[in-house]
Amino acid sequence: MLIAQRPTLIEDPISEFRSRFVIEPLEPGFGYTLGNSLRRTLLSSIPGASVTSIRIDGVLHEFSTVPGVKEDVTDLILNLKELVVSSDNDEPTVMYLRKQGPGEVTAADIAPPAGVEVHNPELRLATLNDKGKLEIELTVERGRGYVSAAQNKQAGQEIGRIPIDSIYSPVLKVTYKVEATRVEQRTDFDRLIVDVETKPSISPRDAMASAGKTLVGLFGLAQELNAEAEGVDIGPSAADAALAADLALPIEEMDLTVRSYNCLKREGIHTIGELVSRSEADLLDIRNFGQKSIDEVKTKLGAMGLQLKDSPPGFDPRQAVDTYGTDAYSPSFSDPSDDGAEFIETEQY
């Protein structure tokens, strides 16, 4: 079985809606393979939402004008194409804009229903004079990529409904480059750098994750031809390898007090992996293993970035250290190999 080193993916945020992702090390040639696939998927296949049609009160077609509105309907449509929305609804959703002049009309004047959000409320849509009045019904749908107004036009649609171009993709720009990187003595590995800029409706991180999910599903079709086919297995990451090494360590490496150590050994807990698979309730069931022993174990595990199976969130190992002191956790003169030693019921530290 051939095993390749697992690459790491690091996000380097540039701004709120732009990030640079670095993936390395990749086998020679895979930088371009992965980079091109990610770029095309990010630009064309990330789900989003967009306005697909509008209906303006008193307007029959897109070449009309609205009394009291500086912009004609064509300009208004161009402005609405810049609207950034997101929708949790699978079905088409209607939102309304109602504004009376004088003054500017912005996206903040739109009243979205539940499940729909306007992400650029500062967008200027139109300008009204003293007698101006604007009422618009906007239909929002979910989709992918780009759909033209002609494709959005439905057979038998009502008079006065104007289909518009829909840009569903929430990703604005994607670039990538491949550099050489070194792994031990080899210098021909690839480092892939992907620069992703998105609309406010999605973060670059979520867009990248969505693209990865799509590609995994598509490439899985080839794997389904023969699930037992031999390939290059990706080895564990450095973090996973370090975790596995920590879990394999004997509990002697934790430098526990003799009391806690002997209680665990009598229970048949010999490695850190066996220890973290137990809950606090499991440990409290051990004879002579009380709350102070629990706190000691949690403190030692916390220093290693580990915790018991059911440790509540927010446990601060440093607080336990401050409470009980570090000296209290140093071994005493008792023999740690005496697994069968008897203890009195009160805990002594």
From Swiss-Prot:
Q: Which UniProt keywords apply?
A: DNA-directed RNA polymerase, Nucleotidyltransferase, Transcription, Transferase
- GO biological process terms on file: DNA-templated transcription
List compositional bias (Acidic residues) regions by residue number: 336-349
Q: Where is this region: Disordered?
A: 309-349
EC number, as in UniProt: 2.7.7.6
Q: Which reaction does it catalyse?
A: RNA(n) + a ribonucleoside 5'-triphosphate = RNA(n+1) + diphosphate
Q: Where is this region: Alpha C-terminal domain (alpha-CTD)?
A: 241-349
Gene Ontology MF term list = DNA binding; DNA-directed RNA polymerase activity; protein dimerization activity
- Region annotated Alpha N-terminal domain (alpha-NTD), chain positions: 1-226
Q: Which GO terms describe its cellular component?
A: cytoplasm; DNA-directed RNA polymerase complex
Q: Which family does it belong to?
A: Belongs to the RNA polymerase alpha chain family.
Q: How does it assemble?
A: Homodimer. The RNAP catalytic core consists of 2 alpha, 1 beta, 1 beta' and 1 omega subunit. When a sigma factor is associated with the core the holoenzyme is formed, which can initiate transcription.
What biological function has been recorded for the protein in this entry? DNA-dependent RNA polymerase catalyzes the transcription of DNA into RNA using the four ribonucleoside triphosphates as substrates.
Q: What is known of its domains?
A: The N-terminal domain is essential for RNAP assembly and basal transcription, whereas the C-terminal domain is involved in interaction with transcriptional regulators and with upstream promoter elements.
UniProt cross-references to NCBIfam families, sorted A to Z? PRK05182.1-2, PRK05182.1-4, PRK05182.2-5, rpoA
Output this protein's name.
DNA-directed RNA polymerase subunit alpha
- To which species is this protein native? Frankia casuarinae (strain DSM 45818 / CECT 9043 / HFP020203 / CcI3)
What's the name of its gene? rpoA
